[in-house]
Regions:
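Glycan-processing catalytic domains of CAZymes
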Residues: 21-161
Length: 161
């Protein structure tokens, strides 16, 4: 058709993964999203009650239909606490065993220097352990009360960017 063009890109299959045709096949890396909410922080104590972590919500899960096994009790590492260096090392060891090549840490930076849930990542940086590749994923959203099922829809902490 006049005035129209068709672009065709070559594709190759490298180890079962489709990639754009180039000088060499690119390899996709398997990374795991790392949620740092599995340790207590003062803000969560204030908003949700002393000792709140994401495990609190796991324990509240209910069975809604036949064969719906809830709440699920975590296997292998149990109800771990990310303040414990051995837990973080065990997670990296397990990830490596199953072919995961790195963690993508959720990074809660709200602006004006305010960060939350930063302790596990800070300890990894300070100690260099576990020796496991990583990246950061900025969780750029404000927190409101309804996120955990309460009727309070007030702003808990605002994202300023």
């Amino acid at each position: 058709m006049p005035g129209h063009s068709l672009a065709v890109q070559g594709l190759a299959v490298c180890s079962g993964i489709r990639v754009r045709l180039s000088d060499q096949c690119m390899k996709a890396r398997l990374l795991a999203l790392y949620l740092p909410q599995f340790h207590p922080i003062p803000e969560n104590d204030l908003w949700w009650g002393k000792g709140f972590t994401e495990w609190t919500n796991v324990g509240k899960a209910r069975r809604y239909f036949r064969n719906h096994y809830q709440p699920r009790v975590p296997a292998d590492l149990g109800y771990y606490d990310l303040r414990v260096a051995e837990t973080r090392q065990a997670q990296a060891d397990m990830a490596r065993e199953y072919g995961v090549e790195g963690f993508v840490y959720r990074h809660y930076w709200f602006g004006n220097g305010k960060r939350l849930l930063e302790r596990p990542f800070n300890e990894v940086l300070a100690s260099g352990e576990p020796d496991f590749p990583f990246a950061l994923a900025w969780a750029n959203e404000s927190w409101r009360g309804f996120a955990h099922g309460i009727t309070n829809r007030n702003m808990l902490i605002e994202q300023l960017y």
